[in-house]
């Protein structure tokens, strides 16, 4: 959520920056609402003061033995006017808040300007894609060869965009997640967390999934039903519960940064993705991911983004998977992000790079929604923290890349050395 004061005092400047990401801010409407808010605010305060004054006069008139009925009627009328003004003001403030909640974050000044993924800027590459001397099989074919990926069984159990993993491929999938967690906790300084997979609406508002992206979530009950303690949604990413751990908290600056990680399933409806990536593990309704979250001082967030992206890169480097680092343009960034790097891993069967990690600096956008603040040791003043999140990595897509990049001519899959301790020394699947 953007700073309301900024929207009130510099709407044109905000609109200009948001236009770079393809968002049109209705400045005229905002101004009109703000002017009406000021009028109602003054009207409410004046009515309250007048009512208080008249109420005091009733006591004085009564003490003098005067007829207080006219004053009482006047106070009642003022009370009705005050209630009406308060009601209108509350409705207006709710409308302003709804508009504010639908406004995306302002892109950082060094984010490349563009409309979509075609305007993203490649920053660097690591590794050289392998040249195969045999016909490359995709991960679906390899999975079927080894009996490890059963999409038909998942359709029977649930539906499309799900999978049943079996045997050594299921073990390899688990090994990948364990390897990522061990790397981030033992070498990168993150604390491991186990979090709920169901969260309430306040939590989803905090990180920006609600109200704009309600259709992307799996809800336990229809959203239009009255919210209560049982109105949950499945998490689309561990970013949601991890980041909300600091909601309504004031953190001593000396305790920052806070670096957290978690391995969870993620659940997404993939609304708007009909017909895209229908084969295999690339786009699923349920997939596993190891997430990284950092809570930092505002002045440290840009450096933290570079660090976090490097942590995700380290996973790919240790696995020996070629990838490229891409700076997302303004039109391709997520709703809450002010700057984002994507890591795209080489997928041989598709002869292209595919996203496997997205690392974002969210600035104070989520912190303002969550009222997550830090306190200075010197002057005891509080300010909003900055939050960052990144995939470290998407486990299913890492499995895809590993299977295809490490496949052998006979269909066997070589296991990278760093994973063999998690596979009881196994060198090949198949």
From Swiss-Prot:
Subcellular location: Cytoplasm
Transmembrane segments: none
Binding positions (ATP): 268-270, 355-358
Domain of life, per lineage: Bacteria
Annotated positions binding L-serine: 237-239, 291, 391
Pathway connected to this protein: Aminoacyl-tRNA biosynthesis; selenocysteinyl-tRNA(Sec) biosynthesis; L-seryl-tRNA(Sec) from L-serine and tRNA(Sec): step 1/1
Main location group: cytoplasm
Keyword check for Acyltransferase: no
Molecular-function GO term, any one: serine-tRNA ligase activity
Catalytic activity as recorded in UniProt: tRNA(Ser) + L-serine + ATP = L-seryl-tRNA(Ser) + AMP + diphosphate + H(+); tRNA(Sec) + L-serine + ATP = L-seryl-tRNA(Sec) + AMP + diphosphate + H(+)
Cytoplasm among keywords: yes
HAMAP family given in the database record: Ser_tRNA_synth_type1 (MF_00176)
Described purpose of this protein according to its UniProt entry: Catalyzes the attachment of serine to tRNA(Ser). Is also able to aminoacylate tRNA(Sec) with serine, to form the misacylated tRNA L-seryl-tRNA(Sec), which will be further converted into selenocysteinyl-tRNA(Sec).
Subunit-structure text: Homodimer. The tRNA molecule binds across the dimer.
Family named by the database record: Belongs to the class-II aminoacyl-tRNA synthetase family. Type-1 seryl-tRNA synthetase subfamily.
Protein name, entry field: Serine--tRNA ligase
Naturally occurring in which organism (per UniProt): Klebsiella pneumoniae subsp. pneumoniae (strain ATCC 700721 / MGH 78578)
Gene name for this UniProt entry: serS
């Amino acid at each position: 959520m953007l700073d309301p004061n900024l929207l009130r005092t510099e709407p044109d400047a905000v609109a200009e920056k948001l236009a770079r990401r393809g968002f049109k801010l209705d400045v005229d409407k905002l101004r009109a609402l703000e002017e009406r808010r000021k009028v109602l605010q003054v009207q409410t305060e004046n009515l309250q003061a007048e009512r208080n004054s008249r109420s005091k006069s009733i006591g004085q008139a009564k003490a003098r033995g005067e007829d207080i009925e006219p004053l009482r009627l006047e106070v009642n009328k003022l009370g009705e006017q005050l209630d009406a003004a308060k009601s209108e003001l509350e409705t207006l403030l709710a409308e302003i808040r709804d508009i504010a909640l639908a406004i995306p974050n302002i892109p950082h000044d060094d984010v490349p300007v563009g409309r979509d993924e075609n305007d993203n800027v490649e920053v660097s590459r690591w590794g050289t894609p392998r040249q195969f001397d045999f016909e490359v099989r995709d991960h679906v074919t390899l999975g079927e060869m080894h009996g490890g990926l059963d999409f038909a069984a998942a359709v029977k159990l649930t539906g499309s965009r799900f999978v049943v993993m079996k045997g050594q491929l299921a073990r390899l999938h688990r090994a990948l997640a364990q390897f990522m967690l061990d790397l981030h906790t033992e070498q990168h300084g993150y604390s491991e967390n186990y979090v709920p997979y169901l969260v309430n609406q306040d939590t989803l508002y905090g990180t920006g999934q609600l109200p704009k992206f309600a259709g992307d979530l799996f809800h336990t009950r229809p959203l239009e039903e009255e919210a209560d303690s049982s109105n949950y949604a499945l998490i689309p990413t561990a970013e949601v519960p991890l980041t909300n751990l600091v909601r309504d908290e004031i953190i001593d600056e000396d305790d920052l940064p806070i670096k957290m990680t978690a391995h969870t399933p993620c659940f997404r409806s993939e609304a708007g993705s009909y017909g895209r990536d229908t084969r295999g593990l690339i786009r699923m309704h349920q997939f596993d991911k190891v997430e990284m979250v950092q809570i930092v001082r505002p002045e440290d967030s840009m450096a933290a983004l570079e660090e976090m992206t490097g942590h995700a890169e380290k996973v790919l480097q240790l696995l020996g998977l070629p990838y490229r680092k891409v700076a997302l343009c303004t039109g391709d960034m997520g709703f809450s992000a002010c700057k984002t790097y994507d890591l795209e891993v080489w997928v041989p069967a598709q002869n292209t790079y595919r996203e496997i990690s997205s690392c974002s600096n969210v600035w104070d956008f989520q912190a303002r929604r969550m009222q997550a603040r830090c306190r200075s040791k010197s002057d005891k003043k509080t300010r909003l923290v900055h939050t960052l999140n990144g995939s470290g990595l998407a486990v299913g897509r890492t499995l895809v890349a590993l299977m295809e990049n490490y496949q052998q001519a006979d269909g066997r899959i070589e296991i990278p050395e760093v994973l063999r301790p998690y596979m009881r020394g196994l060198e090949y699947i198949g």
